[in-house]
Amino acid sequence: LDMDKIEVNEDISQESRKIMKGYQTIAMFGLDNRSNGNLSQGRSDVIMLANINNDTKEVKLVSVYRDTYLDTGDGIFQKCNAAYAKGGPEQAISMLNVNLDLNITDYVTVDFNSIIECVDLLGGVDMEITDDEASLMTGYIRELNELTGNKAENLTQGGTYTLNGVQACAYARIRYGG
């Protein structure tokens, strides 16, 4: 991360800056780049902020919807998920800082492969899946298997399952259904 490229909103009041010193805010980006490990480019289809109270260690999460129109740099307003594709984490963090009056310096970026590896390292995740969701997961599982070289099985019907990484990532990608 090139800190010289990170912008902050200079109009933040001294009072707000004082309050912000008691907190750490971490930007979290989930990329839909299908390049299996290349975290330097791609649209950030997931943008979340983790705000940590340094005294109490309380964590609050906020999601910034990917279709939110923000100034992504140089006065250009477009869907905020374009900032990461346009200028990497520096541009995406700058966009959040300038538009939301923040001073973010830390971030985490994941892609499909990162999610798959994390879930597999944890031994899977227990989920109750509906018949509709099992059907919708099929195409995503096929695509993720091709991208990653995995051989995860499709779910033929609903039920309670311990999903492996590919299956969990496929489930997370469902955008519609009953």
Question: Where are the predicted features?
Answer:
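Non-catalytic, solvent-exposed segments at the cell envelope interface
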Residues: L1-G178
